[in-house]
Amino acid sequence: MDPLVSAASVLAAALAVGLAAIGPGIGQGNAAGQAVEGIARQPEAEGKIRGTLLLSLAFMEALTIYGLVVALVLLFANPFA
């Protein structure tokens, strides 16, 4: 494999994981903070808030996993080689 393609693939994989983690990380922090605030305001709605929070956290985490999959494809099954 060409060393330039190999180096570009490693950099692209690093960017894929890094950028894919920034958005969901910020979103998960905001969602958890708002959920805690909502539970503090209405303790009787805790079950509904928690269920909605966990579902939304799972969807946000899926974006990070997609970035990891792209990085693994670039590193081990490089389509540009």
From Swiss-Prot:
The record marks E61 as: Reversibly protonated during proton transport. It is found in: Cellular thylakoid membrane. The keyword Thylakoid applies. It comes from the Bacteria. One of its GO terms (molecular function) is lipid binding. It is a multi-pass membrane protein. Pfam families: ATP-synt_C. The keyword Ion transport applies. GO terms for cellular component: plasma membrane-derived thylakoid membrane; proton-transporting ATP synthase complex; proton-transporting two-sector ATPase complex, proton-transporting domain. Its main location: membrane. The chain crosses the membrane at residues 7-27, 57-77. NCBIfam families: ATP_synt_c (TIGR01260), PRK07354.1 (NF005608). Belongs to the ATPase C chain family. F-type ATPases have 2 components, F(1) - the catalytic core - and F(0) - the membrane proton channel. F(1) has five subunits: alpha(3), beta(3), gamma(1), delta(1), epsilon(1). F(0) has four main subunits: a(1), b(1), b'(1) and c(10-14). The alpha and beta chains form an alternating ring which encloses part of the gamma chain. F(1) is attached to F(0) by a central stalk formed by the gamma and epsilon chains, while a peripheral stalk is formed by the delta, b and b' chains. This is ATP synthase subunit c. The gene is atpE.
